[in-house]
Amino acid sequence: MSDRIRILLGRVCNKKMNKSVVVSIERLIKHSTYEKFIKRTTKLHVHDPNNETNVGDLVEVQECRPISKTKSWILTSIIKKSNF
């Protein structure tokens, strides 16, 4: 197991649960045949202990111990608030 802490940036896409949000992480991969860059999206369930985020916020998340069946990430900071 790696000792390095995994930190990712993403956008909040769902906030219908108590103390939990769904964060969408976008990354670029290169197609092996066509050599074109393609966007891929991963959705993570993130623990938000203070319920301080809204949909559309740009956030930083960090991997942690499993909090529930699907939550293994915790919110570390809000980088940019959304307009709505």
UniProtKB/Swiss-Prot annotation:
Superkingdom: Bacteria
CDD domains given in the database record: Ribosomal_uS17
PROSITE patterns documented for this protein: RIBOSOMAL_S17 (PS00056)
Keyword rRNA-binding: yes
Alphabetized UniProt keyword annotations: Ribonucleoprotein, Ribosomal protein, RNA-binding, rRNA-binding
Listed GO biological process terms: translation
Molecular function terms, GO-annotated: rRNA binding; structural constituent of ribosome
Gene Ontology CC: one annotated term: cytosolic small ribosomal subunit
Subunit and interaction comment: Part of the 30S ribosomal subunit.
Xref: HAMAP family: Ribosomal_uS17_B
Function: One of the primary rRNA binding proteins, it binds specifically to the 5'-end of 16S ribosomal RNA.
PANTHER family (alphabetical): 40S RIBOSOMAL PROTEIN S11 FAMILY MEMBER, SMALL RIBOSOMAL SUBUNIT PROTEIN US17M
Protein name: Small ribosomal subunit protein uS17
